[in-house]
Design a protein with these regions (language model features):
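Aromatic "clamp/platform" in nucleotide-sugar-dependent glycosyltransferases that forms part
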Residues: 122
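Donor nucleotide-sugar binding/catalytic pocket of nucleotide-sugar-dependent glycosyltransferases
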Residues: 1-42
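Short alpha-helical donor nucleotide-sugar binding micro-motif in glycosyltransferases
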Residues: 101-102, 109-114, 195
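Short hydrophobic beta-strand element within catalytic cores of glycosyltransferases
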Residues: 139-142
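Conserved donor-binding/catalytic core segment of Leloir-type glycosyltransferases
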Residues: 9, 45-74, 78
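A charged, aromatic-enriched C-terminal amphipathic alpha-helix characteristic of glycosyltransferases
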Residues: 173-216
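Nucleotide-activated donor-binding/catalytic signature segment of Leloir-type glycosyltransferases, i.e.
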Residues: 87-105
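Short acidic/histidine- and often glycine-rich active-site loop of Leloir-type glycosyltransferases
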Residues: 29, 88-90, 144-161
Length: 223
């Protein structure tokens, strides 16, 4: 169905590579974005022991939350989200704080009041919560896997380590402003600009029956 397309957009380099191995041509990157008018640093106090290490997302087995909750960390382990594993996790980890699902301004305030965003999943292909946390000024601690690796790469805004505890502690040394600056280049405006750039690179149809051609111009940088 997609193979005749002039361009196939993929959200991450890993997804783009997977599509190419499956025979898809003209694969181009179109990353996701974050609403920096909502997610940004602000002075909020959750009245919890610090540092605060939040993890945000669906509470399910595939999210690997126990890898985070098993860690012996200073301060508070904060879990935001709901899902089928919530009751079992609350029983097993009474020392962690479970807030349930939060959205919009309420979620943004939780990010802003925290210190290090912990992303224990090894199965996510992107993870918009990573960008939300970074925009709020939170360095990221995660495993070096698809998802965090695609979003953060080699940028000094997080620590990717097979030892998640080490990642959490080392991330405390990362300046929050570096995270905000990184996220500023990944807004929804920037994402839309990349989409438009890709669309403009499709040559218009000539004679009836002619297939439009996609002209690749290398990496696109949204202004």
């Amino acid at each position: 169905f997609h193979r005749p397309s002039q361009a196939v957009m993929a959200a991450t380099p890993a997804l783009a590579a997977e599509l190419r191995t499956r025979g898809f041509g003209n694969v181009v990157l179109w990353s996701r974005g974050v609403d920096t008018s909502l997610f940004h640093p602000r002075e909020i106090d959750l009245c919890l022991p610090q540092p605060v290490f939040p993890s945000v997302g669906r509470l399910a087995v595939e999210k690997n939350l126990e890898a985070f909750l098993d860690l012996d960390l200073p301060g508070t382990k904060l879990v935001v989200g709901d899902g089928p594993a919530r009751m079992a996790l609350e029983r097993k980890y009474p020392d962690a704080v479970f807030l349930g699902a939060r959205h919009g301004e309420e979620l943004a305030e939780i990010y802003a009041a925290a210190d290090i965003f912990v992303f224990p999943s090894k199965t996510d292909t992107f993870g918009l919560v990573l960008l939300e946390a970074l925009a709020s000024g939170l360095p990221v601690a995660a495993f070096p896997v698809t998802g965090p690796r695609d979003v953060i790469g080699a940028s000094p805004v997080g620590v990717l380590n097979e030892d998640l505890h080490t990642a959490c502690i080392e991330a405390l040394r990362i300046p929050r402003q570096a995270c905000v600056a990184f996220a500023a280049g990944h807004t929804w405006h920037a994402s839309a600009r990349v989409f438009v750039d890709h669309a403009l690179n499709v040559r218009p149809l000539g004679s009836p029956g002619e297939v439009a051609e996609f002209v690749a111009e290398g990496p696109h940088v949204a202004a």
